[in-house]
């Protein structure tokens, strides 16, 4: 029997990789629902390839444009909707068994929660769910007895090495260091968005590419790991590994260190999660250690990467600091991508917003959303002070 799958964020890099893996196993999966932001032409192509029952676009204009395109292509039977409620409905559709949660940013929280509350199996690629609302999110996962499998390559690697979690001393999340790891510090002042998005190893969207360049992405992953594996910040370390071959490690109290290795291709963790506890073909080429690059490791430079330090600070501060961190970072990164904020001022906007707001831990989802909105407003105010355009 095939398993019905909904892909939240189908036109993004994780969504496309998921569809690539799923298409290799048509006897196991059927595409029930796809969601996207604004890439109408790409979504129409996906519809022609996979014939979902439902498609949801972020905006009504994009949805209408897609309806016209699908009609012209003879695919009028595909239902097209738009907006946040339609996103949630896609995640909880009766024909959906499993949900790939791959919407980037805070926008992914509500539809992913809808999937959890509907009892779907959830593949979590949206780290903001745990960064913004970790306690509430995991509480819902336990309440609804949902199977939650991590998709981020680092957390998937830890999951594969973690076993039952007994005897774990610490986990080590690896990081490539991004495109600017070896750049002279004075050159960072004139970094452009295109340079920041040119990741040396991974193919990713623009927002997550900038987060990788600042190492905020690794900071968010530290917070995510805290909730996924129930470990304090003191037992989560970050190691720079420029080759992105070792995806993370788990150290045990007896001195053993288990590592998960593989070529840097998101189809590997996706296939692992989709097949768990079995294995399936992913299309990823075999790792050739004999002819590959030498493996290097170094500690992260927190002076060069202040966003990583800010994320650790937010996790240790508790309360809603991580929610504030995430909201301020989204505002700052978007401003950088639009040319309104220099690269080196991203961390300053986040730090100033964290310094101004110290809200208590949220008791309800509405509290999370209110804190997120307030943090965005405060970040915009600080952006006006720091944002002098590209230097």
From Swiss-Prot:
Name it. Answer: 1-deoxy-D-xylulose 5-phosphate reductoisomerase
What does UniProt list as this organism's lineage?
A: Bacteria, Pseudomonadati, Pseudomonadota, Acidithiobacillia, Acidithiobacillales
Q: Which PANTHER family match?
A: 1-DEOXY-D-XYLULOSE 5-PHOSPHATE REDUCTOISOMERASE, 1-DEOXY-D-XYLULOSE 5-PHOSPHATE REDUCTOISOMERASE, CHLOROPLASTIC
Q: Respond yes or no to whether keyword Signal is given for this record.
A: no
Gene this protein is translated from: dxr
Name the keywords, alphabetized: Isoprene biosynthesis, Manganese, Metal-binding, NADP, Oxidoreductase
Q: In which pathway does it act?
A: Isoprenoid biosynthesis; isopentenyl diphosphate biosynthesis via DXP pathway; isopentenyl diphosphate from 1-deoxy-D-xylulose 5-phosphate: step 1/6
Q: Which GO terms describe its molecular function?
A: 1-deoxy-D-xylulose-5-phosphate reductoisomerase activity; manganese ion binding; NADPH binding
Residues reported in the UniProt entry to bind NADPH = 11-14, 126, 128, 205
InterPro entries in alphabetical order: DXP_reductoisomerase, DXP_reductoisomerase_C, DXP_reductoisomerase_N, DXPR_C, DXPR_C_sf, NAD(P)-bd_dom_sf
Give the residues the record marks as binding 1-deoxy-D-xylulose 5-phosphate: 127, 153-154, 176, 199, 212, 217-218, 221
The reaction(s) catalysed by this protein are: 2-C-methyl-D-erythritol 4-phosphate + NADP(+) = 1-deoxy-D-xylulose 5-phosphate + NADPH + H(+)
Chain residues that bind Mn(2+): 152, 154, 221
NCBIfam families cross-referenced by the UniProt entry: Dxr, PRK05447.1-1, PRK12464.1
Q: State the top-level EC class.
A: oxidoreductase
Q: What is its EC number?
A: 1.1.1.267
Functional note: Catalyzes the NADPH-dependent rearrangement and reduction of 1-deoxy-D-xylulose-5-phosphate (DXP) to 2-C-methyl-D-erythritol 4-phosphate (MEP).
Sorted alphabetically, which Gene3D superfamilies does this protein's record hold? 1.10.1740.10, NAD(P)-binding Rossmann-like Domain (3.40.50.720)
Name the species this protein comes from.
Acidithiobacillus ferrooxidans (strain ATCC 53993 / BNL-5-31)
Q: Which cofactor is essential here? A: Mg(2+); Mn(2+)
């Amino acid at each position: 029997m095939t398993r019905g799958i909904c892909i939240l964020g189908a036109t993004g890099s994780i969504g496309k990789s998921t569809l690539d893996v799923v298409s290799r196993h048509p006897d196991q999966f059927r595409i029930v629902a796809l969601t996207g932001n604004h890439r109408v032409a790409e979504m129409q192509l996906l519809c022609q390839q996979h014939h979902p029952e439902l498609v949801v676009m972020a905006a009504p204009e994009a949805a209408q444009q897609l309806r016209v395109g699908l009609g012209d292509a003879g695919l009028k039977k595909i239902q097209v909707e738009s907006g946040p409620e339609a996103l949630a409905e896609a995640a909880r559709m009766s024909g959906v068994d499993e949900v790939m949660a791959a919407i980037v940013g805070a926008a992914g929280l509500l539809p992913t929660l809808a999937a959890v509350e509907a009892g779907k199996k959830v593949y979590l690629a949206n780290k903001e769910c745990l960064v913004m609302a970790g306690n509430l999110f995991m509480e819902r996962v336990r309440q609804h007895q949902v199977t939650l499998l991590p998709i981020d390559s680092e957390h998937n690697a830890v999951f594969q090495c973690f076993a039952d979690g007994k005897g774990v001393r610490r986990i080590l999340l690896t990081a490539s260091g991004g495109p600017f790891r070896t750049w002279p510090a004075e050159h960072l002042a004139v970094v452009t968005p295109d340079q920041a998005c040119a990741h040396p190893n991974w193919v990713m969207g623009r927002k997550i590419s900038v987060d990788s360049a600042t190492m905020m992405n690794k900071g968010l992953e530290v917070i995510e790991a805290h909730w996924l594996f129930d470990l304090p910040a003191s037992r989560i370390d970050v190691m720079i590994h420029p080759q992105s071959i070792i995806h993370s490690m788990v150290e045990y109290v007896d001195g053993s260190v288990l590592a998960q290795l593989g070529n840097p291709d998101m189809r590997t963790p996706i296939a692992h999660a989709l097949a768990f506890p079995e294995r399936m073909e992913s299309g990823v080429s075999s790792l050739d250690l004999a002819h590959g690059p030498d493996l290097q490791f170094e500690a992260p430079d927190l002076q060069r990467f202040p966003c990583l330090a800010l994320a650790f600070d937010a996790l240790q501060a508790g309360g809603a600091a991580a929610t504030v961190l995430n909201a301020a970072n989204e505002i700052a990164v978007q401003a950088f991508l639009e040319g309104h904020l220099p690269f080196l001022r991203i961390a300053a906007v986040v730090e100033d917003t964290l310094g101004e707001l110290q809200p208590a831990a949220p008791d309800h989802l509405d509290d999370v959303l209110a804190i997120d909105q307030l943090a965005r407003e405060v970040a915009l105010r600080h952006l006006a002070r720091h944002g002098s355009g590209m230097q």
